[in-house]
Amino acid sequence: MGVAVRTYYASPRHRDDYLESWLELWEGKPGKSALLPGYGWIFGMGDGTCNVGLGILNTSSAFGKTDYKDLLKRWLDNTPDDWAFRSENMIGPVRGAALPMGFNRQPHYERGLLLVGDAGGMINPFNGEGIAYAMESAEIAATAMAEAHGRGPGSPAAERALASYPIKLKAQLGGYYTLGRTFVKLIGHPQVMRVCTRYGLPRRTLMQFTLKLLANLTDAKDGDAMDKLINALSRIAPAA
């Protein structure tokens, strides 16, 4: 489980070419100020504004004990002035939401009810992404419902079609999400995150592997060695 807050700022960075992820949040100068809990992001919307926010996982000791809006302000107040991430440039309020992830809401099917997206805890624990997985689970659910309808609503055959939904869902994402839950437990420890950022970030090949793993960007059929390793780990991991 996680919590995220975000807001929008009028900023010259609105046309940045890339999404920016912050694995460490500092209250001042990096390495010489307080290390804040959580991770952050900045991405330009291309319309004069930037979406800026931070998230905290429940594996962090700060989870549930922190004023997340204040935490966001403390981080952004120490970013460069020309980025314009200041209160006077904020467009709208800071909004927050829970991040149900890694299949933490189950069962996914019970007595005719199928859970998709956030209702079923389907946010990717590796990166906090939820929209794509909501759509993917909805497609699997819709297929099961169509099969059930074709077999005759209320019939035993229809029930079997509906009951196949969580099975197919776990076959598709279960192992990968199990890896993600393990990842979340590890990065909840600041010492682990510090070692990973210090020794991992400078290594391009390792970062390419990390990007594929965290973003779930592997090729299931014709991928390279990295794809095959990640796919193998996902198959081996229990689909719980």
Regions found by a protein language model. Give the residues of each.
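Aromatic side chains
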Residues: 8-9, 39-43, 75, 103, ...
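A general structural signal for short secondary-structure boundary/capping elements
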Residues: 22-29, 86-92, 98-101, 210-218, ...
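FAD/FMN-dependent oxidoreductases across multiple families
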Residues: 58-144, 150, 157
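C-terminal helical "tail/cap" subdomain of flavin- and related membrane-associated enzymes
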Residues: 146-240
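Predominantly flavin-linked oxidoreductase catalytic cores and closely associated redox partners
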Residues: 1-87
